[in-house]
């Protein structure tokens, strides 16, 4: 496929697919392109994008992390439990939330370290190591909540998780951060969810780390050719441990954001995101063989799936049909990567 049109289609198929989605759902889904519809896409996309970013780091090294969904659920429970305990101990709601977030992110690094040591030091296949870690984490999550969703979180958590950067009210104009007080029945427009901004900041840091630092270059080297990377002086064991810890950090952050948005903790909160996270990375141009992939591409893949999820729901399509669509998209992405790698991975 050396024809210019064929090359363009192979390299830009994801963008074209996104454009097709937007065109179809703008007609089939009532209100899809409205402010509310767009922000539903963004809300769904936050958890998905953070998990997909976690997967990007691992897939670039030639591995895969099957624990991120369980880690997300674990983080929702730990953050909710910590927040409630600190609040009951007499700390202010704001300080309770802040310390719970920091503590959860720190605790979340432990499963990532375990996976990294299993893969990097003991040479356990990544899918087995992370599946085992995920199972352990899920079991601990179930023990922590005893089959009941973790609650008793300060109400401020919900206010933070569902806040916006900008508000607009008739006669009041724009308001930054705080929702203006208006008379009953007056509609206030909300713009830019705060959790979307927080997600964008961390994803941006992840993109910089992977593409602009020596750490990122070493990750690509390990995924491209492990033996050559070792001969070049890279310590794969130590580096892979760090990569899986970063993956766990992003998964834990996703869980914290979920807790803030829904003010609860659930062991299975992230399970349904696992397949989508992997698919988003592949759609974004990453190779499951390692050495290729970008966070920017993952953002595009996550956006495609978030639009698909929202569009199908607004069009009244059954939930299970979404899984069929995601599976077909994954097959398409893998086939394009398999048969036209020299076209889609060649630098512009």
Where are these regions (language model features)?
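Single transmembrane alpha-helix segments in multi-pass membrane proteins
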Residues: 23-89, 117-124, 228, 283-296, ...
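Hydrophobic core segments of alpha-helical transmembrane domains in multi-pass membrane transport
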Residues: 14-27, 55, 105-108, 134-142, ...
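Transmembrane alpha-helical segments in multi-pass inner-membrane proteins
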Residues: 244-252, 257, 261-327
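Transmembrane helix-bundle core of multi-pass membrane transporters
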Residues: 126-212, 239-242, 262-270, 345-348
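Cytosolic-side transmembrane-helix boundaries in multi-pass membrane proteins
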Residues: 1-23, 27, 231-238, 308-348
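Alpha-helical transmembrane segments within multi-pass membrane transporters and channels
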Residues: 88-134
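Interfacial loop-to-helix junctions that mark the boundaries of transmembrane helices
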Residues: 4-11, 35-41, 91-102, 177-196, ...
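Helix-loop-helix "hairpin" substructures at the membrane interface of multi-pass membrane proteins
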Residues: 97-104, 110-115, 175, 186-265
């Amino acid at each position: 496929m050396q024809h210019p049109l064929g090359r363009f289609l192979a390299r830009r198929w994801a963008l074209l697919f996104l454009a097709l989605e937007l065109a179809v759902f703008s007609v089939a889904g009532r209100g899809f392109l409205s402010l509310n519809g767009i922000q539903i896409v963004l809300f769904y996309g936050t958890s998905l994008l953070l998990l997909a970013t976690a997967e990007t780091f691992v897939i670039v090294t030639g591995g895969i992390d099957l624990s991120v969904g369980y880690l997300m659920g674990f983080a929702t429970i730990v953050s909710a439990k910590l927040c409630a305990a600190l609040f009951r101990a007499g700390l202010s709601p704001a300080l309770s939330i802040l310390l719970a977030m920091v503590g959860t992110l720190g605790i979340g690094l432990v499963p990532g370290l375990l996976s990294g040591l299993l893969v990097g030091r003991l040479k356990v296949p990544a899918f087995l190591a992370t599946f085992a870690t995920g199972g352990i984490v899920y079991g601990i999550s179930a023990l922590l909540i005893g089959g009941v969703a973790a609650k008793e979180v300060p109400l401020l958590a919900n206010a933070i998780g569902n806040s916006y950067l900008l508000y607009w009210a008739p006669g009041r104009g724009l308001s930054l951060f705080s929702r203006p007080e208006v008379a009953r029945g007056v509609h206030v427009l909300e713009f830019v969810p705060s959790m979307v901004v927080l997600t964008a900041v961390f994803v941006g840091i992840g993109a910089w780390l992977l593409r602009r630092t020596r750490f990122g270059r070493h990750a690509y080297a390990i995924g491209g050719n492990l033996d050559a990377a070792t001969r070049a002086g890279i310590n794969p064991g130590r580096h892979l441990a760090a990569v899986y810890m970063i993956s766990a950090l992003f998964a834990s952050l996703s869980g914290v954001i979920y807790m803030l948005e829904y003010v609860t903790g659930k062991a299975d909160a992230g399970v349904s995101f696992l397949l989508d996270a992997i698919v988003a990375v592949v759609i974004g141009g990453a190779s499951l063989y390692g050495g290729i992939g970008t966070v920017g591409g993952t953002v595009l893949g996550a956006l495609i799936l978030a639009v698909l999820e929202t569009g199908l729901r607004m069009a009244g399509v059954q939930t299970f049909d979404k899984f069929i669509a995601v599976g077909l998209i994954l097959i398409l992405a893998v086939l394009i990567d398999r048969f036209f790698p020299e076209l889609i991975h060649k630098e512009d």
